[in-house]
């Protein structure tokens, strides 16, 4: 047994309702309306689940819900999620800065990768989820002297970095690294 065992997993659901005796729903043309309602219901559950992953589960009063002494505060706030400071008091790299050199961004990516692999013993292949600002900056050419690959291409060559993907829940200099290998 580990001290971090257990996570509260709420059930996410949504629904839609049609009056089954309504004659319109006894015709084939009603299938499109029912399919649209089902799609809307599924999208609602997906939005709630993504919010739960990033921001945790709160009760109606806005407090984190607790069950059997367990709670989930989301990737941003939970104590069981490793947080690495990218600011001046940490790794000191701003992946969104257009003035940062490609070499500095690559060095910052190596430091971040090593923090996860060496310090936290995370040896699975990493998938990096980054903000839109970071993804835009990583699409710059690595060298201005000749148009070779992008900064993202260079980071993807690093051992252990399998993919870099954009996530709309992230903003600014936020990165979520998930071992998916």
Which residues does each predicted region cover?
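Residue-level signal for secondary-structure boundary elements
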Residues: 49, 53, 117, 121-124, ...
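Short, hydrophobic/aromatic alpha-helical segments in well-folded domains
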Residues: 37-40, 108-115, 151
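Sequence/fold signature of self-assembling virion shell proteins
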Residues: 87, 136-181
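Hydrophobic, Leu/Ile/Phe/Ala-enriched alpha-helical segments that form helix-helix packing faces
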Residues: 45, 49, 109-119, 155, ...
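Structured, hydrophobic secondary-structure cores that serve as assembly/anchoring elements
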Residues: 56-59, 66, 100-141
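Helix N-cap / beta->alpha transition motif
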Residues: 19-21, 130-134, 179
């Amino acid at each position: 047994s580990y001290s971090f065992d257990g996570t509260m997993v709420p059930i996410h659901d949504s629904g839609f309702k049609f009056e089954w005796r309504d004659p319109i729903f006894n015709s084939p043309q009603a299938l499109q309306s029912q399919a649209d309602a089902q799609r809307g219901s599924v999208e609602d559950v997906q939005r709630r689940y993504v919010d739960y992953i990033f921001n945790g589960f709160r009760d109606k009063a806005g407090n984190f819900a607790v069950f059997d002494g367990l709670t989930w505060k989301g990737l941003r706030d939970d104590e069981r999620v490793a947080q690495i400071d990218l600011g001046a008091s940490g790794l000191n790299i701003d992946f969104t800065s257009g003035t940062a050199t490609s070499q500095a961004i690559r060095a910052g990516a190596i430091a971040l990768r090593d923090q996860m692999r060496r310090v936290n013993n995370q040896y699975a292949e990493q998938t990096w989820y980054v903000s839109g600002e970071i993804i835009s900056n990583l699409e710059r050419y690595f060298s201005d002297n000749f148009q070779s690959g992008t900064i993202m291409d260079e980071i993807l060559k690093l051992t252990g970095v399998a993919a870099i993907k954009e996530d709309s829940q992230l903003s600014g200099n936020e990165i979520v690294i998930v071992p998916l290998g």
